[in-house]
């Protein structure tokens, strides 16, 4: 049998396909930044967390009512797609922690978390293999601001609620006191950490693992005054940010702005020649691929902590 194989044809991208590829790559890069920022909460994620986060970001950007395809990012997005996103579906926060909570902003623009009463015995539903080990719990709220157009994020404030296995605490309101920058997207996560008491030294060991680590994004607020897209690569400097905030600011390897700039060049080139720039090579390096999270992050299971007295 003779097999005749022809030479593969060059794939010519249309302007629309280039926009779609750019938007997908931008979503992947954005999701990677969010996962990195929430690393303490994201450490014990399940195997599909990366793809799930990218999908939520992609849907958010596609749901934009203000930006045009290929010229928009998460600052234009419908952030409702991010609310409720679980970092570990093996132990969903919404199922493990049976506590009413609401997040809002008051007249001063501060973020307010209203947390219902918690009876640890009934409100915290642990898997059977953890029930006899856990003696204390910590509920952590992490507020992080993102400015993708200036390529940084900022740790704004953390709040903890601590409770023992047999304790009941009353309903409470937490007001985040940090002054909130108007150019940042604000994301708030909620994480439940379980601890085992160590009688010898009165410390507690963390029990969270990839099999049990309830954590989710519970609120997302759009930037009030989003910055303009940068016309050239960022200098990765903290220009314009008060020095007092520098210790909490993290500069990021975000690719979204570069992808949008390159898309404009490709479309202009195609309009002139009828052939997209670098069509033969495809320039695939400009579009990040989604890869499942790998590597060996520091395992904090068994990490000892001390609880303050209330």
Regions found by a protein language model. Name each.
Residues 6, 84, 94-100, 237-238, ...:
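Short linear recognition/processing motifs and adjacent strand/loop elements at protein termini
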Residues 62-232:
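Charged linear interaction tracts used for macromolecular binding and regulation
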Residues 1-91, 256-310:
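Long, polar/Ser/Thr-enriched low-complexity segments
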Residues 1-11, 16-18, 25-26, 35, ...:
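Intrinsic structural disorder
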Residues 156-169, 177, 198-310:
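Short beta-strand elements
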